[in-house]
């Protein structure tokens, strides 16, 4: 598998414009990225632009705080699928995890998994920068129990992004059959190679073109 096919080509800034989405989808077609990862408002346009392409549309759910109710997250998923999303990256209820309310964390993830079942792949963002190692392990275990397809490190909107150490811990926790996505601060081919070596099977990056072309990113982004 080429590096491009492991990358979710990402544009999640709040000031993202239509022109930027058109560029993103054009680049996805050109380079063969796994997906474009966009905010829900851009799902329909992205799906139209990628009709017939190998790249699919990924969107974010309960993003970036994870503090919506399970019911709201489930509605977001259904709306996104209706608009053409094939993958959804949800943020867990981080406060509930900190409170050791594992039942709520699981119910929250399961609401998204159930809403997406058979229609979209689910990635669960655990926001590693806010968690202890014990909490990272617990979050991954709950996500697997709830039926996720992937676990993912970060939103790119908090205090830190992906590290090889966290990827290795997540991979060890979920085993070989669940995907692990590194996201947040992955900007170069060298960064990607480190993450893959640690166990990542998907990369979230706004610098996708720079990564596959070997060029330096125009400016650093956290996601």
From Swiss-Prot:
<keyword id="KW-0963">Cytoplasm</keyword>
<comment type="similarity">
    <text>Belongs to the DeoC/FbaB aldolase family. DeoC type 1 subfamily.</text>
</comment>
<dbReference type="InterPro" id="IPR002915">
    <property type="entry name" value="DeoC/FbaB/LacD_aldolase"/>
</dbReference>
<comment type="function">
    <text>Catalyzes a reversible aldol reaction between acetaldehyde and D-glyceraldehyde 3-phosphate to generate 2-deoxy-D-ribose 5-phosphate.</text>
</comment>
<keyword id="KW-0704">Schiff base</keyword>
<dbReference type="GO" id="GO:0006018">
    <property type="term" value="P:2-deoxyribose 1-phosphate catabolic process"/>
</dbReference>
<keyword id="KW-0456">Lyase</keyword>
<dbReference type="InterPro" id="IPR028581">
    <property type="entry name" value="DeoC_typeI"/>
</dbReference>
<dbReference type="InterPro" id="IPR011343">
    <property type="entry name" value="DeoC"/>
</dbReference>
<dbReference type="GO" id="GO:0016052">
    <property type="term" value="P:carbohydrate catabolic process"/>
</dbReference>
<feature type="active site" description="Proton donor/acceptor">
    <location>
        <position position="89"/>
    </location>
</feature>
<dbReference type="GO" id="GO:0005737">
    <property type="term" value="C:cytoplasm"/>
</dbReference>
<feature type="active site" description="Schiff-base intermediate with acetaldehyde">
    <location>
        <position position="152"/>
    </location>
</feature>
<protein>
    <recommendedName>
        <fullName>Deoxyribose-phosphate aldolase</fullName>
        <ecNumber>4.1.2.4</ecNumber>
    </recommendedName>
</protein>
<dbReference type="GO" id="GO:0004139">
    <property type="term" value="F:deoxyribose-phosphate aldolase activity"/>
</dbReference>
<dbReference type="GO" id="GO:0009264">
    <property type="term" value="P:deoxyribonucleotide catabolic process"/>
</dbReference>
<dbReference type="InterPro" id="IPR013785">
    <property type="entry name" value="Aldolase_TIM"/>
</dbReference>
<comment type="pathway">
    <text>Carbohydrate degradation; 2-deoxy-D-ribose 1-phosphate degradation; D-glyceraldehyde 3-phosphate and acetaldehyde from 2-deoxy-alpha-D-ribose 1-phosphate: step 2/2.</text>
</comment>
<feature type="active site" description="Proton donor/acceptor">
    <location>
        <position position="181"/>
    </location>
</feature>
<dbReference type="Pfam" id="PF01791">
    <property type="entry name" value="DeoC"/>
</dbReference>
